Amino acid sequence: MPLMAKAAAMSGAVGIRANTVRDITQIKEVVDLPVIGIIKKDYPGTPMYITVTMKEVDELVACGVDILAVQGTGALRPDGSTSAEFIRAIKAKYPDQLVMADCDNFENAMACAEAGADFVGTTMRGYTPETQGIDDIDFDFVHKLATECPAKVIAEGHIHYPEQAV
């Protein structure tokens, strides 16, 4: 992954999104770009898999991730907490840590932003039961978030061609 990050930086990337403490640590050693960090892990009984527990948050903060991303959908975490409750707990423990919520719909994005997420991403749109079947970038969704959500918006997922990113 460090070589991929170097290639991305040389091509003009302004940030890197990476999974696992190992990859994040190695990437931060070779590029001077902000890193959005996640830890993907499956948990029985929940569809949540992107930075699901405080243990993963602690690991990401310890490795110096610039922005910590968590799943911000309507499913409950293994401990029964909502995405908004989890974000509030992260901000209480790490008030200076930037947090991104990987969301699927407007309601979840707003709840995460109101709970303290600094960024909301469209990452999970099309990947939850509520949004299943959305296979292309949803510009109306991105526009609604950009105009109504208090957090900064990162359009992510289902962007297949450079023309879609403009």
Task: Give the residues covered by each predicted segment.
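Charged helix-capping and loop-helix junction motifs
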Residues: 2, 49-55, 81-87, 134-143
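Glycine/Thr-rich beta-alpha phosphate-binding loop at enzyme active sites
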Residues: 67-79, 113-141
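Glycine/small-residue-rich loop that forms an oxyanion/phosphate-binding "nest" at active or ligand-binding sites
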Residues: 32-81
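Glycine-enriched alpha-helix->loop->beta-strand junction motifs that scaffold or abut catalytic
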Residues: 12, 31-35, 63-67, 93-96, ...
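Short beta-strand/loop segments at the ligand-binding rim of alpha/beta enzyme cores
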Residues: 31-45, 86, 91-104, 146-157
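Catalytic cores of alpha/beta
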Residues: 45-60, 104-118, 151, 155-166
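Short, ordered loop/turn segments at secondary-structure junctions
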Residues: 21, 40-42, 72-75, 104-105, ...
